[in-house]
Amino acid sequence: MRQCNRDAWNKTYRAQVSSEYWEDECQEFSFMDLPRRTRFIRHAVATLILLPLALITAMSLCDQLAHASGSLNILFSIPVWYALMGAAVWVVLGSSRLFTSSLLYLYVLGHELTHALAVICSHGSIHAFKADLDGGYIQTDKNNIFISLSPYFLPLWAMLWGLVWGVTYLFWPTVTCQAILYSGLGFWWCFHLFWTAWIIPKDQPDLADNGTFFSLILVYFANLLLFLALLRLFNAVSLHRFLADCIHNAEKLWDVLRDLAMLAAGLFL
């Protein structure tokens, strides 16, 4: 159940979860309840700013990965090799369905914990919290875009894995410890991507309440930036070359849009 005080924007997040579905029982607040000016601004920001930035970032990441794939030193480096091994472990576990309930519970718990951490970062209060296989919710006196969408682009378990590793590495600074870090990041990143892709098509109120188009573009762009940070951690990309690719791809995108605009003008004028 989701309850919303439209004056104070107090919200209760409650999602019912199983291996087949994830849905909110009711929605008292929706994107259409926002002022028309706010809706227009979000659509404009998503279309004119976030979408072009996401396209340029995706194109530049593809260029960087193409450069990296041609370098055996990068492909067989310790970070990339062990991250791929961790990802392979997730693929085996995810496809076997032997631990579906446990993995689903971890995702539900992580989803609600991320909401809770976002509330704390936003100086809000948490009044109730629940996460189990039957459902999960967080009740808070504060809501904003970051609180609503943070579980879709912040891989909580990967972040906690990195935090635990950082403490461990202070006392055990070995190559083995580094291998554990990279393999764990590969596993938990794939875990995050899989469940995020699984849950988004299931009519999530978190996305709809902020405008589905705006939310999807923002989540996509944020995940691209986190993926860039992960690749940089693995020394698989160069920030200097990435920025150069961004400038080049921005010019290409501008040329394409200009040509399309001229073509449309020729057809209708």
Describe each region flagged by the PLM.
Residues V80-V91:
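Canonical hydrophobic alpha-helical transmembrane segment
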Residues Y107-I120:
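Active-site recognition of the HExxH zinc-binding catalytic motif
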Residues Q27, I78-V80, F99-S101:
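N-terminal start-of-chain detector that recognizes signal peptides
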Residues W90-G110, Y137, D141-I145:
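Short pre-active-site segment immediately N-terminal to the catalytic Zn-binding motif
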Residues V119-A128, W195-A197:
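Membrane-water interface of transmembrane alpha-helices
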Residues R2, R6-S69, I74-F76, A87, ...:
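Metalloprotease/metallohydrolase-associated module, dominated by Zn2+-dependent proteases
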